[in-house]
């Protein structure tokens, strides 16, 4: 048996002592930069290519089946998930899904700025938090009207000098001015009798893609709004004050810019289709309530959607066509059903964004 011997320092065998670390070096290890893609990136690219390589007719049939089986939320988030697969799937989903004007459904974030349904009003409700001066708009899916309903928009009220301002956002966690999820605002005058609705993300040609840092997708936890491309006035709300009837119902008038949209749903990343729509100005006036002698109060027919008498309850009507009943011209109604819960029903030509902004102007004390 050969005895073990200590190797000399001049031996070619490696020493058992660890090599001394060079002085003043960075201990962090950097990956070797290579011109070739990593295997993981290659697999992701190949997977996306396989999804986009489906036959367009077959893909359209698949999305039609998914859309037909997802009539209401939350199952309708499957349609949004399909549109998020790749560009090809998004284009087909936009062609398959009808806008709220035709389908009566809200699917994509762009639906919030499209005209409401033509046949029946879109039933929503607003929850108010007096402590934080915040307001949340939900799509009414059940009669309970809880926070589990489909979230649409949120707003926060703050005072800037002598004016009050509401920041409207599509992210319930981004309720502050300057947030990337803000889509517009509502600003009042000193007396609170005149409000201006501004759209920070007007849908016109040149609107860019979503920002990945801007909140949540519509229907799950990955919603991203359009990149802000401007500041456009899209409406104005005025409250009239009468010296002869200081304790009468509020009288309000609203002038809004209503885009005329036809066809399929608008791709949130494509502003060209919205650029073809021609905005038209429309003046809406509050419906005059009737005096009820037995109840000794002013009354309006809300068709069971309002439960509590309040000075905030109102109905906005469009100009009446010859021979058309006045009940069919109500395009927006707002009413109180609890201390901090209000219903909001809107229809064509208003969008959810415009209707929400008009209802926000009704909160607070004003000389009207």
Swiss-Prot record:
<dbReference type="Pfam" id="PF01167">
    <property type="entry name" value="Tub"/>
</dbReference>
<dbReference type="InterPro" id="IPR000007">
    <property type="entry name" value="Tubby_C"/>
</dbReference>
<dbReference type="InterPro" id="IPR025659">
    <property type="entry name" value="Tubby-like_C"/>
</dbReference>
<comment type="similarity">
    <text>Belongs to the TUB family.</text>
</comment>
<feature type="compositionally biased region" description="Low complexity">
    <location>
        <begin position="1"/>
        <end position="17"/>
    </location>
</feature>
<feature type="region of interest" description="Disordered">
    <location>
        <begin position="1"/>
        <end position="44"/>
    </location>
</feature>
<dbReference type="InterPro" id="IPR036047">
    <property type="entry name" value="F-box-like_dom_sf"/>
</dbReference>
<feature type="domain" description="F-box">
    <location>
        <begin position="49"/>
        <end position="104"/>
    </location>
</feature>
<protein>
    <recommendedName>
        <fullName>Tubby-like F-box protein 2</fullName>
    </recommendedName>
</protein>
């Amino acid at each position: 048996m050969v005895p073990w011997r200590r190797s000399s320092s001049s031996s070619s065998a490696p020493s058992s002592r660890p090599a001394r670390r060079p002085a003043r070096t960075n201990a962090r290890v950097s990956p070797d930069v290579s011109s070739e893609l990593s295997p993981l990136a290659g697999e992701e690219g190949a997977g996306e290519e396989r999804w986009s390589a489906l036959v367009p007719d077959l893909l359209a049939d698949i999305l039609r089946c998914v859309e037909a089986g997802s009539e209401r939320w939350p199952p309708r988030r499957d349609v949004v998930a399909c549109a998020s697969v790749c560009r090809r799937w998004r284009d087909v989903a936009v062609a398959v899904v009808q806008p709220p004007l035709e389908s009566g459904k809200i699917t994509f974030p762009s639906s919030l700025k499209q005209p409401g349904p033509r046949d029946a009003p879109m039933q929503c409700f607003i929850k108010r938090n007096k402590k934080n001066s915040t307001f949340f708009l939900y799509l009414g899916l059940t009669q309970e009207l809880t926070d589990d309903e489909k979230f649409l928009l949120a707003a926060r009220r703050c005072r800037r000098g002598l004016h009050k301002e509401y920041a409207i956002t599509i992210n319930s966690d981004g309720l502050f001015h300057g947030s990337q999820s803000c889509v517009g605002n509502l600003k009042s005058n000193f007396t609170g009798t005149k409000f201006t609705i501004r759209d920070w993300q007007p849908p016109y040609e040149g609107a860019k893609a979503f920002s990945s840092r801007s909140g949540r997708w519509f229907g799950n936890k990955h919603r991203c709004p359009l990149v802000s491309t401007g500041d456009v006035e899209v409406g104005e709300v005025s409250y009239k004050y009468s010296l002869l009837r200081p304790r009468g119902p509020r009288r309000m008038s609203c002038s809004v810019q209503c885009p005329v949209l036809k066809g399929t749903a608008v791709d949130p990343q494509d502003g060209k289709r919205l650029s073809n729509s021609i905005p038209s100005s429309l003046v809406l006036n509050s419906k005059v309530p009737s005096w009820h002698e037995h109840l000794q109060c002013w009354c309006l027919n809300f068709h069971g959607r309002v439960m509590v008498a309040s000075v905030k309850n109102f109905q906005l009507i469009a100009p009446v066509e010859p021979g058309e009943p006045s009940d069919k011209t109500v395009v927006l109604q707002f009413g109180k059903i609890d201390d901090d819960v209000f219903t909001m029903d809107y229809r064509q030509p208003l969008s959810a964004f415009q209707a929400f902004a008009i209802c926000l102007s009704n909160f607070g004390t004003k000389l009207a």
